[in-house]
Amino acid sequence: ADSGSAVVALTNDRDTSYYGEIGIGTPPQKFTVIFDTGSSVLWVPSSKAHSMYESSGSSTYKSQDSVTIGDLVVKEQDFIEATEEADNVFLNRLFDGILGLSFQTISVPVWYNMLNQGLVKRFSFWLNRNVDEEEGGELVFGGLDPNHFRGDHTYVPVTYQYYWQFGIGDVLIGDKSTGFCAPGCQAFADSGTSLLSGPTAIVTQINHAIGANGSEELNVKFGLTPEQYILKGEATQCISGFTAMDATLLGPLWILGDVFMRPYHTVFDYGNLLVGFAEAA
């Protein structure tokens, strides 16, 4: 079991992103960040734009600093202080930076240090589908919130430790198999991506039919209804939640963004190298 835990309340920004609050430094300087399972770096703006990190205002600053998430304090965390940003980076956005939760690449992610400092071994996401409710979502470091899922999670092993990546066996449109993934496809759950991305050949079919019933793994189906994969735009405009992307990583690659993670409570378990899905509640 995890020795500690922290619950982070998330704000839903029009179904396009989910962000919550962290603190950096001693005393903590507060920032709102997107918790992104598709990247590994923590970065916040330096004291030149937006909510800004001021290194001289922290007694623990060394080019690393303490990061406070809920009741957890992660010590000596590397992060990027962004001193310059493109003018439109934060256009109409309510968050300051990004906290990466994928595997170690060029820096040590926050959750690696949580693990190494004996704090937590897993974290889980619940993303609220109702933009009108005050509670936008919840990120739990160190456990699961039983109020936000039904039944048991279906766990799949991580196949490649760069993203939280796993294999999928089939993609169905309606109840019909496309057969596209018979030779093998890969996917990763990405809380920092708004849409669901996949190979052009299949996404074109989905967007033509706009009747996807989901993805299949280990003979367990995860369905998507029109309310879950169609986004609301201006007035009478509707936007497809599927977007084409022809990338490969051990096979054709799907990115299961917020469109997928809203209906499915998602667990990222580093202790056992598993990703788990259960119906969200």
Swiss-Prot record:
Sugar-bearing residues?
N213
Tissue distribution: Pistils.
What switches its activity on or off, per the activity regulation note?
Inhibited by pepstatin.
Cite the EC number: 3.4.23.-
Q: Does the keyword Glycoprotein apply?
A: yes
- Pfam families according to UniProt: Asp
List all disulphide bridges recorded for this chain. C181-C185
Q: Which GO terms describe its cellular component?
A: endoplasmic reticulum; extracellular region; membrane; protein storage vacuole
Q: A single GO molecular function, which one?
A: aspartic-type endopeptidase activity
Q: How is it modified after translation?
A: N-glycosylated.
Recorded hits in PROSITE patterns, A to Z, give: ASP_PROTEASE, PEPTIDASE_A1
Any stretches that span the bilayer, and where are they?
none
Superkingdom, taxonomy of origin: Eukaryota
Active site positions, chain numbering: D36, D190
Q: Which UniProt keywords apply?
A: Aspartyl protease, Cell wall, Disulfide bond, Endoplasmic reticulum, Extracellular matrix, Glycoprotein, Hydrolase, Membrane, Microsome, Protease, Secreted, Vacuole, Zymogen
- A GO biological process this protein is involved in? proteolysis
Q: Where in the cell is it found?
A: Microsome membrane; Protein storage vacuole; Secreted, Cell wall; Secreted, Extracellular space, Extracellular matrix
Homology family: Belongs to the peptidase A1 family.
| Name this protein carries in UniProt | Cardosin-F
Q: Which organism is it from?
A: Cynara cardunculus (Cardoon)
